[in-house]
Swiss-Prot record:
Mitochondrial membrane ATP synthase (F(1)F(0) ATP synthase or Complex V) produces ATP from ADP in the presence of a proton gradient across the membrane which is generated by electron transport complexes of the respiratory chain. F-type ATPases consist of two structural domains, F(1) - containing the extramembraneous catalytic core and F(0) - containing the membrane proton channel, linked together by a central stalk and a peripheral stalk. During catalysis, ATP synthesis in the catalytic domain of F(1) is coupled via a rotary mechanism of the central stalk subunits to proton translocation. This is ATP synthase small subunit 6, mitochondrial. PANTHER family: ATP SYNTHASE SMALL SUBUNIT 6, MITOCHONDRIAL, TRANSMEMBRANE PROTEIN. Keywords: CF(0), Hydrogen ion transport, Ion transport, Membrane, Mitochondrion, Mitochondrion inner membrane, Stress response, Transit peptide, Transmembrane, Transmembrane helix, Transport. The chain crosses the membrane at residues 20-39. The lineage of its organism: Eukaryota, Viridiplantae, Streptophyta, Embryophyta, Tracheophyta. It is found in: Mitochondrion inner membrane. It is a single-pass membrane protein. It comes from Solanum tuberosum. One of its GO terms (biological process) is proton transmembrane transport. Residues 1-15 form a transit peptide. GO terms for cellular component: mitochondrial inner membrane; proton-transporting ATP synthase complex.
């Protein structure tokens, strides 16, 4: 006898409540990644934030 697997039921039920969070998280991550990769080496060198967090 197969055991009942609750995960598919859980994900199907919770998807309608959680999709805005997941999509927002993905969009925010894509924007941050795109902006970060767009910096030139000169901009990184002159950044006050980067200077403060340099090891």
């Amino acid at each position: 006898m197969r055991q009942f697997d609750p995960w598919p039921v859980f994900f199907r039920r919770e998807w309608s409540r959680n999709w805005p969070f997941l999509v927002g998280f993905a969009v925010t991550g894509a924007i941050i990644t795109k902006m970060s990769l767009g910096f030139t080496e000169e901009e990184r060198k002159n950044s006050r934030f980067a200077q403060r967090h340099k090891n």
